[in-house]
Amino acid sequence: MRSRCTEIFFEPLDRTAVEKIAENSLRRAGISYEEGLCGRIAAYAGGGRDAVNLVQSLTSLAWMEGKKKITARELEWAAEAGRYQPLYRQKIAKQPQVGVVNGLGVQGNGRGTLLSVEAVVQKGGNGLTVTGIVEEEELKNGQGTAKRKSNARSAAENVLTLLEQFGFSAQDFYVHLNFPGGIPVDGPSAGVAMFLAVYSAFTEIPVAHTLALTGEVGLHGQVLPVGGVEQKLAAAKEAGATKVLIPKQNWKENYHNLGIEVIPVATVQELLGAVFLSEGAALSEGIDFLQEKEIG
């Protein structure tokens, strides 16, 4: 018989929904709790199931110790006992900064997250350092184990190669890219964020702190599609971003209704035009600037 089953995927719950689940679970348990506890539970919970499990641990602890009210102290104990770690939810910075850009990623639990990307450029040297990423990955198969270089580092190398094709020599500059925050980053989807961070550091033009972006960058300046765009857009909005750039091939019409400005771009030239619209910046202008000015 032909199967008529449909595979259904559920999107990860946002923090507000997880807080509501924790609140309902505590209410059903019939125990009082200090103000703000539901938000603290949501900070540890990767989803509704984690929230319910934490509440069950908390109510059991309160019952064993004869307590009538659950506090943050009990939550910390339950989280440590269950090996829950606070989930990383970064907010946008308060002001723009040269060489700093908001990238977007997806965590292991399927939730989107804001990723700060920092770039420093020094003239008179050469080389590339990328920190805060997964340096290499082990791939195991039936015939043994192989090691693969980090996709994030490969994306950074693509950025420098792209700049060289526009007349800039990477041999004259030392570039350091960093992903702060303690989360090992991998994957090519931070390519456009790294490109923009390096461009900002080169030209000393700050990028708006309310902007976030995602996309892979190709060697000829194309912005390539990536996964997890819906989760990334939700994370950008939650973090306080007001504008997000995504690959044109990832565009969907319903992105008009998200309460955040979503701009599709196909090339890095389009990206720079969208980012530096008021300055009228273009990549060629940035390269001319570099060739005329020493940057330390």
Which role fits each region the language model picked out?
Residues 68-118:
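Extended amphipathic alpha-helical scaffolds
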Residues 45-59, 69-72, 87:
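The conserved phosphate-sensing helix
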Residues 6-18, 265-266:
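Conserved AAA+ ATPase "SRH/arginine-finger" region at the nucleotide-binding site
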Residues 47-50, 57, 114-116, 120, ...:
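Conserved P-loop NTPase
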Residues 4, 17-32, 57-61:
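Conserved AAA+ ATPase "sensor/coupling" helix adjacent to the nucleotide-binding pocket
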Residues 18-23, 32-46, 71-74:
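Short conserved motifs of the RecA-like P-loop NTPase core
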Residues 20, 88-89, 97, 121-296:
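Peripheral, non-AAA+ core regions of ATP-driven protein-machinery
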Residues 1, 5, 18, 41, ...:
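Conserved RecA-like P-loop NTPase ATPase core
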